[in-house]
């Protein structure tokens, strides 16, 4: 029995109790769908639900009264061994071995679909992440967003959402001008401007521009030549780095297009006509305090140029016009102020602030030999995506950056990530998957198979009764809810942490329970049955690693 099946059984018991008149619901009041979760204390059963406490007020009864009514009905559900009432109204449910073990067969039969859901079906989500300026290689913070953003997209898709991965290409503004001046200075053999960019990559890009445009220094506007060609070259490198990292985008949106085709000006006129802007001190201001911001924001500066927020507002409207139901922005730690202003901008447009969601990420530090790694050979100032991948590889880089909550600062220990040991989390999980594959190969050689020659399953769920098997089945059963929560809370690290727990449960089971007979012993039904459990673990590990964009090796 899967957790979803048990949850449905609890909900059915609740509806049956209402239909039988044991519980009375006021007209127009909807009862919640019951959900079961794994209790922290295994002595409290296999699964627990708080549904009695959730519905008590709606039916005018105490939580324990509701729990008593539900427990009597649940006890009659096939596969349920015992139902205990605890505390204010918790229902602790223990399944019999056959019902619990049936999960192994269910997982294998569902395959890659196990852990997916439809909670977000029909929802189009625009997920913008990385969006690094094309003025240099992707730094470590952008690398974290690449790993987390792509994993979040996969998790949201696993819950049925249509996700548009979008990269906002900032090719408008002062930073691009500084980049162009830096390239031009290096091409002329001069020092970089005081506010310019340094690093070997500037020299490399400058030389590439000269190779493409030999007469660039003698052109009518050398800086414009270096700006246009340099941005194109740098962005091509960024795209290539992301692709090698396993991250590809559906849309690369050019900021400059918002200004070139008049979207910003049209938007500002719309805001003026709706009295959402006012003129003061020579500038145009957005009445953002009326929509929850801590202060009004300048939209058109006193020099007549648009402030950054003008482009941000136009960009949000553009996303909505393209069909996004929800716009998720993944921004760095220095962008906390954007949350309120983007929501205020949405409200000023007459849109819902709930259509804007901002995730703020914190800093990443690399450590080697106990010391912080601060310099990049190529960039000259910060550690880049290429620096990290060169040392640990794509899998370890993506996994290590995704296994932490984005709102926490993290230290990545390069020494740990290059070790083939259990203290290396990505190795620990990948090795568990490789071990399941090895067990399956050995089982095949020993004549242990999931089905007989006629294709009928060789499986008896009641034989999966060892305590280590109960633990392993519990970890398997939790996986769908972990994925659902990862989507709900925008926290793909939940998947990584659960895979580590599952890998641990599998390694302990491997040490305690044999899939193949010992020595010349005969193959028995328990061996065939355990192969189902082994393969269920393999499937869930593969499914979870895929959500993280990490490979699931068959041999290590």
Swiss-Prot record:
One of its GO terms (biological process) is arginyl-tRNA aminoacylation. It is found in: Cytoplasm. Its EC number is 6.1.1.19. PROSITE patterns: AA_TRNA_LIGASE_I (PS00178). InterPro entries: aa-tRNA-synth_I_CS, Arg-tRNA-ligase, Arg-tRNA-synth_N, Arg-tRNA-synth_N_sf, ArgRS_core, DALR_anticod-bd, Rossmann-like_a/b/a_fold, tRNAsynth_Ia_anticodon-bd. GO terms for molecular function: arginine-tRNA ligase activity; ATP binding. It holds the Pfam family Arg_tRNA_synt_N. SUPFAM superfamilies: Anticodon-binding domain of a subclass of class I aminoacyl-tRNA synthetases (SSF47323), Arginyl-tRNA synthetase (ArgRS), N-terminal 'additional' domain (SSF55190), Nucleotidylyl transferase (SSF52374). It comes from the Bacteria. It catalyses: tRNA(Arg) + L-arginine + ATP = L-arginyl-tRNA(Arg) + AMP + diphosphate. A motif ('HIGH' region) lies at residues 132-142. Signal peptide: none annotated. Coiled coil: none annotated. The keyword Aminoacyl-tRNA synthetase applies. Its main location: cytoplasm. Keywords: Aminoacyl-tRNA synthetase, ATP-binding, Cytoplasm, Ligase, Nucleotide-binding, Protein biosynthesis. The keyword S-adenosyl-L-methionine does not apply. SMART domains: Arg_tRNA_synt_N, DALR_1. One of its GO terms (cellular component) is cytoplasm. Belongs to the class-I aminoacyl-tRNA synthetase family. Monomer. This is Arginine--tRNA ligase. The gene is argS.
């Amino acid at each position: 029995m899967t957790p979803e099946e048990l949850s449905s059984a609890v909900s059915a018991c609740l509806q049956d109790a209402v239909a039988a008149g044991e519980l009375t619901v006021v007209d127009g009041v909807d009862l919640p769908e019951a959900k079961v979760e794994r209790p922290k204390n295994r002595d409290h059963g296999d699964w627990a639900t708080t549904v009695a406490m959730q519905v008590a007020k709606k039916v005018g009864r105490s939580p324990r009264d509701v729990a008593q009514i539900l427990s009597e009905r649940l006890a009659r559900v096939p596969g349920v061994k015992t139902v205990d009432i605890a505390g204010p109204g918790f229902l602790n449910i223990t399944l019999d071995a056959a019902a619990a073990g049936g999960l192994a067969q269910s997982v294998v039969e569902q395959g890659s679909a196990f852990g997916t859901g439809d909670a977000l079906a029909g929802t189009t989500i625009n997920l913008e992440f990385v969006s690094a300026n094309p003025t240099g290689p992707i730094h470590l913070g952008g690398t974290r967003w690449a790993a987390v953003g792509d994993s979040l997209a996969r998790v949201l898709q696993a819950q049925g959402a249509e996700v548009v991965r979008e990269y906002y290409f900032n090719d408008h503004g002062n930073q691009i001008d500084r980049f162009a001046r830096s390239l031009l200075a290096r091409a002329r053999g001069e020092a970089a401007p005081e506010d310019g960019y340094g690093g070997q990559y500037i020299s490399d890009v400058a030389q590439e521009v000269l190779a493409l445009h030999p007469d660039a220094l003698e052109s009518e506007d050398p800086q414009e030549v270096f700006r246009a060609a340099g941005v194109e070259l740098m962005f091509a490198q960024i795209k290539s780095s992301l692709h090698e990292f396993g991250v590809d985008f559906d849309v690369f949106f050019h900021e400059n297009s918002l200004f070139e085709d008049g979207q910003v000006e049209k938007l500002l006129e719309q805001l003026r006509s709706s009295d959402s802007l006012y003129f003061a001190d020579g500038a145009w201001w957005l009445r953002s305090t009326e929509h929850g911001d801590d202060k009004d924001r300048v939209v058109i500066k006193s020099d007549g140029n648009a402030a950054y927020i003008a482009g941000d507002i136009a960009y949000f409207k553009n996303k909505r016009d393209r069909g996004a139901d929800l716009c998720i922005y993944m921004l760095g730690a220095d962008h906390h102020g954007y949350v309120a202003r983007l929501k205020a901008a949405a409200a000023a447009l007459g849109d819902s602030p709930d259509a804007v969601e901002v995730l703020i990420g914190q800093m990443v530090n690399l450590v080697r030999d106990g010391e912080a790694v601060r310099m990049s050979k190529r960039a000259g100032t910060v550690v880049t995506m290429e620096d990290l991948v060169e040392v640990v590889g794509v899998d370890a880089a993506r996994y290590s950056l995704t296994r932490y909550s984005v709102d926490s600062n993290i230290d990545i220990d390069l020494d740990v990530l290059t070790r083939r040991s259990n203290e290396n989390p990505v190795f620990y999980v990948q090795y568990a998957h490789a071990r399941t594959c090895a067990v399956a190969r050995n089982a095949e050689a020993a004549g242990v198979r999931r089905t007989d020659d006629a294709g009928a399953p060789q499986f008896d769920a009641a034989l999966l009764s060892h305590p280590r098997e109960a633990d392993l089945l519990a970890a398997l059963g939790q996986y769908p809810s972990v994925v659902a929560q990862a989507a709900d809370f925008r926290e793909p690290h939940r998947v990584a942490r659960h895979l580590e727990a599952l890998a641990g449960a599998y390694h302990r089971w491997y040490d305690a329970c044999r899939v193949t007979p010992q020595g010349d012993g005969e193959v028995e039904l328990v061996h065939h049955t355990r192969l189902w459990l082994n393969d269920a673990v393999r499937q869930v590990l593969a499914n979870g690693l895929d959500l993280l964009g990490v490979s699931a090796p068959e041999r290590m």
